């Protein structure tokens, strides 16, 4: 039975629920407010703290450059406020459609796709020249080819417009969290494993840097390093290969050579710079607001146990057994006073097939530990819909890896967890009953708490980002540090 105890409240981890993808449809209409209201009321009664929602660029700015229409989202946000829930808003600069679980299709704005007709290199491109229209290539971040604006300026203008149009909801602290979209699925990564191009789990994926802008960037970097003869990889295989069938990832493969290391450093640094630049713009846009900024990092757990970590490398995470690819991201997040939001919290190694060389548990431990060592807040999500006690218990374990502390704050505690996703399946009675138990256990057996100060989550006005982090400091962060120890199971089971 839930209660309220001052010390136990310091163990409280808020729970948010991701709203369905098509709540606001592709025509910018809030489709079923009454149906959603009914579900939001049930979530609030279950003790849920808030909801997360994609705010689609392809919907808001679809009519033309800087022609924003926030009206449907405004009415949705007001409904969320009426229902007594907090809001996490994702600046979704990616396409919906083509990824795991995408049931609706929301492309990028048509005026952007039109530019892509004459200049297809604005999109990520694999070695065989297939374009991916999910998200603009990092190569155009600073190219003023979008009616005079760069991609970064587009994202910046969008966030400023959001702040202006949602100022009342920001002031009333309904919107508490801005998730800054940095890539496909809103995640800081390359679209290395696109289902709509035939990728299937556990394929290693493909590098996505063969558009002319990224190719030019690589050639310039190679020339500067005294190796103008170096080209982008041509030996890394295709989407559904295994590492050993490629020259690049095989034992003693290209990835371990000077040329391979140079490429992987460049490829991953492009991603770091991209995240850093857009977070800087987000920080300027929301400066002084009582909100947290956050970024999403993808849980690429397949091939994690192989020495080459191939699937992580193609996605842009240069993570090997002797090189930490995630702590540099945490460093950048810390510069902007942001949160690192990680996925696959529900997965256990024992559930994975051995041919994927997968270890979601070790990956989660590594990424969360790296965040905590950099003194940032870490939040998370489940990757796939689950309604069973085993998955919920795993999420609770990751939320408090060393259990609750009855005398005060626990040593390790995630900042929050967002459950994927609100659906008729979740609201089905037996599923919802166990979900309600999950919420209580995440709250450390405490009643719902409307005052975040009581669990040390007061949000001060957003401060300006710190100074740019020097390359040598980022490089230092690639040195592996052992993760914090995790309990083998949670002390707050939903079925305990």
Curated annotation (Swiss-Prot):
UniProt-annotated binding residues for substrate: 54, 94, 102, 296, 301, 343, 382-383, 421
Any GO BP: polysaccharide catabolic process
InterPro entries linked to this entry: Glyco_hydro_14, Glyco_hydro_14_CS, Glyco_hydro_14B_pln, Glycoside_hydrolase_SF
Active site: 187 (proton donor), 381 (proton acceptor)
Pfam families cross-referenced by the UniProt entry: Glyco_hydro_14
Disordered as annotated region, ranges: 455-496
Classification via SUPFAM superfamilies: (Trans)glycosidases
Catalytic reaction equation(s): Hydrolysis of (1->4)-alpha-D-glucosidic linkages in polysaccharides so as to remove successive maltose units from the non-reducing ends of the chains
GO molecular function: beta-amylase activity
Alphabetical keyword list: Carbohydrate metabolism, Glycosidase, Hydrolase, Polysaccharide degradation
Enzyme class: hydrolase
Recorded superkingdom: Eukaryota
Listed EC numbers: 3.2.1.2
PANTHER family from the UniProt entry: BETA-AMYLASE 1, CHLOROPLASTIC, BETA-AMYLASE 6
Family label: Belongs to the glycosyl hydrolase 14 family.
Descriptive protein name: Beta-amylase
Source organism (scientific name): Medicago sativa
């Amino acid at each position: 039975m839930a209660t309220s105890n001052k010390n136990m409240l310091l163990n409280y981890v808020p729970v948010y629920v991701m709203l369905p993808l098509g709540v606001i449809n592709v025509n910018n209409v809030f489709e079923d407010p009454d149906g959603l209201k009914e579900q939001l009321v049930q979530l609030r009664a279950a003790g849920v703290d808030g909801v997360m929602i994609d705010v689609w660029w392809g919907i808001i700015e679809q009519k033309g450059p800087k022609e924003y229409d926030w009206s449907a989202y405004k009415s949705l946000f007001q409904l969320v406020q009426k229902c007594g829930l907090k809001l996490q808003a994702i600046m979704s600069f990616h396409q919906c459609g083509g990824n795991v679980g995408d049931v609706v299709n929301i492309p990028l704005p048509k005026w952007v796709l039109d530019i892509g007709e004459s200049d297809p290199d604005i999109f990520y491109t694999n070695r065989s020249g297939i374009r991916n229209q999910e998200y603009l290539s990092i190569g155009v971040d600073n190219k003023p080819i979008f009616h005079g604006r760069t991609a970064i300026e587009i994202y910046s203008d969008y966030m400023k417009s959001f702040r202006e149009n949602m100022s009342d909801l920001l002031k009333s602290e309904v919107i508490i969290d801005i998730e800054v979209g940095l890539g496909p699925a809103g995640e800081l990564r390359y679209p290395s494993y696109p289902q709509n191009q035939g990728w299937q789990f556990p394929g290693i994926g493909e590098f996505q840097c063969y558009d002319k802008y990224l190719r030019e960037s690589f050639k310039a970097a190679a020339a500067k390093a005294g190796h103008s003869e170096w080209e982008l990889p041509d030996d890394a295989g295709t989407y559904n290969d295994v590492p050993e069938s490629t020259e690049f990832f095989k034992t003693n493969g290209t990835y371990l050579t000077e040329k391979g290391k140079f490429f992987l450093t460049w490829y991953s640094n492009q991603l770091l710079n991209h995240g850093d630049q857009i977070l800087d713009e987000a920080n300027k846009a929301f400066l002084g607001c009582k909100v947290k900024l956050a970024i999403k990092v993808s849980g690429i757990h397949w091939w994690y146990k192989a020495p080459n970590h191939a699937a992580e490398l193609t996605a842009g995470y240069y993570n090997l057994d002797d090189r930490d690819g995630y702590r540099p991201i945490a460093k950048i997040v810390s510069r902007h006073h942001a949160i690192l939001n990680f996925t696959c919290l529900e997965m256990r190694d024992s559930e994975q097939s051995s041919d994927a060389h997968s270890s979601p548990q070790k990956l989660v431990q590594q990424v969360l530990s790296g965040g905590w060592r950099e003194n940032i807040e870490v939040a998370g999500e489940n990757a796939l819909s689950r309604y069973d006690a085993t998955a919920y218990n795993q999420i609770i374990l990751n939320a408090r890896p060393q259990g609750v502390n009855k005398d005060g704050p626990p040593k390790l505690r995630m900042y929050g967890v967002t459950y994927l996703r609100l659906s008729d399946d979740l609201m089905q009675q037996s599923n919802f009953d166990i979900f309600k138990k999950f919420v209580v256990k995440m709250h450390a057996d405490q009643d719902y708490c409307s005052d975040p100060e009581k669990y040390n989550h007061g949000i001060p006005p957003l401060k300006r980002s710190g100074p740019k982090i020097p390359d040598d400091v980022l490089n230092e962060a690639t040195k592996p540090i052992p993760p914090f120890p995790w309990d083998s199971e949670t002390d707050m089971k939903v079925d305990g």
